[in-house]
Amino acid sequence: MNRKYRKTVIAGNWKMNKTPTETKAFMTEFKTIMPRGRWCDVALCVPAVCIPAAVRAMRETRIGIGAENCNANASGAYTGEIAANMLLDAGCKYVILGHSERRAMGETNEDVNKKVRALLGGRLAPIVCVGESLAVRDEGTTNEYVCAQVKAAFAGVDADDAAKCVVAYEPIWAIGTGRTATPEQAEEVCAAIRAQLAVLFGEETAQAMRILYGGSMNPGNVD
């Protein structure tokens, strides 16, 4: 990554929705309305069974297909799990890690860290999700809580690998609720995240890393 230039990235996922057939139809339509030019990267992260259909549909476009989760192990007796090398071979470029819905099912900061390192070893770009609950926000400890998640997620990662990652700030209280953080709230937390990245990896790497906001986004509030 050119650390003197931070290219915009737009990423989305549709959770446990759409069959492979529906994915193909959606992607075919999306190609007709996708942003033109090269001012940003676009990532679409889909359920595992939809990855082949998405990759085929987006072949010869600049849209990167990703997965919504992976296992930290390279192989083994982990029934139902998917390894980073499998996702890479299937055509993925990105993987979402630490989404609040995964954390709600017991995924820990340590789990997220193991997955981050597995993906970087497998040449995939992690999209590392962090965010606070409404209780944490009401306590006034949002920045400390989120920065602790960032620090834990990147433990043992060096600056060169960190520069390949994307951080997604997703306040839990704004996911699927119709509520969104104000621009000021989002900017404050994203600034705190970047400051924490600077502590971990230095100012140059921190400024190069891309930070997203997610939570009840729609065409009416994206700007």
Listing of model-derived features with the role each one plays in the protein:
Residues M1-D223:
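Active-site loop-to-helix "anion-binding N-cap" substructures in soluble metabolic enzymes
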